[in-house]
Regions:
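ER/Golgi luminal nucleotide-sugar-dependent glycosyltransferases, focusing on the catalytic module
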Residues: 1-52, 56-237
C-alpha cells in the first residue's frame, strides 16, 4: 500500500533481494541497494545522483543549486579519471579515520558514483573480526573505509592507509560540506545538532568544510607525523 502511494507521486521504488550474508554492520545490504538504485538511475539517463538514508531529511530549499555550484567552482584533479568531484557530508566523516567518508550522503556524477559504490560484498565472518585489533577495525574495516578504499582501487589508486594519503584523496577528489548547508535532520540516537563536536582535537572530530578548504588551498596543511598519536591505541592483545 505505502509503496503504491510513493509510485502515485512519481517515485520509482526498487525492491532488492536480500544478500545471503549481511556483512559487518549490514554493509552488503547497503552496497546492493545503492548499486541497484544507481544502475536504475543510469538507465533512466540521470547524469547526477544523490545517495541518502531514508531516515534522514534535508530541508534546504537550495540544495540542488548549492551542490551544482560547488562542482562548478571545484573541478576534479586531472590526475584521476573522474567526471567531477564527489560531494561528501561532514557528518560522520571523521577527520582522523583513514578514508572515512560518511556513507550517509554522497552526491556526484552517476558514473563516478557507480565507481564509488561498486565494492565486493563483505565475506568476513563475525568470528574473523574478533581477531582484529580494535584500532585496525576502526581504521581499516569500518563500512566507510571499506567502501572508499575499494573506490580508490576502482579508479586505479592503491590505498596507503595513512592520514597523509587520506587527506590527499580528500583534497583531489572530494568536496566536504557541513550538514548545516543541507539543513539536515536526523533524530536517531539523539536530537543534538552537534553530537560529535567537543571543540578540541579528538578522534571523533569531523572533516568540516573549513578543514577541507584548508587542504584544498594549501599542500603544506597535511598533518604532522605526531598527530598519528591521536589514533586510538586500544584493543591491543
Amino acid at each position: 500500500k505505502y509503496l503504491k502511494n510513493f509510485e502515485s507521486i512519481g517515485v520509482k521504488v526498487l525492491l532488492s533481494k536480500a544478500p545471503d550474508f549481511a556483512g559487518r554492520a549490514n554493509l552488503n545490504y547497503q552496497i546492493l541497494s545503492t548499486m541497484k538504485g544507481l544502475e536504475e538511475g543510469e538507465k533512466l539517463g540521470c547524469e547526477y545522483a544523490i545517495k541518502t538514508r531514508t531516515d534522514q531529511r534535508f530541508y534546504s530549499t537550495n540544495l540542488s543549486r548549492d551542490l551544482f555550484n560547488l562542482l562548478k567552482i571545484y573541478p576534479p584533479s586531472p590526475n584521476y579519471n573522474m567526471h567531477s568531484r564527489l560531494i561528501a557530508l561532514s557528518f560522520n566523516s571523521f577527520k582522523y579515520r583513514y578514508y572515512g567518508i560518511s556513507d550517509m550522503f554522497l552526491f556526484g556524477n552517476t558514473q563516478d558514483m557507480l565507481k564509488y559504490w561498486n565494492s565486493p560484498l563483505d565475506t568476513k565472518k563475525y568470528e574473523e573480526y574478533k581477531t582484529i585489533k580494535q584500532k585496525d577495525l576502526w581504521q581499516q574495516y569500518c563500512s566507510e573505509t571499506y567502501i572508499a578504499s575499494h573506490f580508490l582501487k576502482n579508479i586505479g589508486v592503491t590505498p596507503e592507509f595513512t592520514l597523509k594519503h587520506t587527506w590527499k584523496i580528500y583534497k583531489d577528489l572530494f568536496i566536504f560540506i557541513d550538514k548545516e548547508i543541507l539543513d539536515m535532520y536526523w533524530p536517531k540516537y539523539t536530537n543534538l545538532d552537534s553530537r560529535w563536536r567537543l571543540f578540541r582535537p579528538n578522534m571523533l572530530e569531523e572533516m568540516r568544510h573549513s578543514d577541507w578548504l584548508n587542504l584544498y588551498l594549501n599542500d603544506d596543511f597535511f598533518i604532522k607525523e605526531d598527530i598519528e598519536l591521536l589514533i586510538p591505541n586500544i584493543g591491543e592483545n
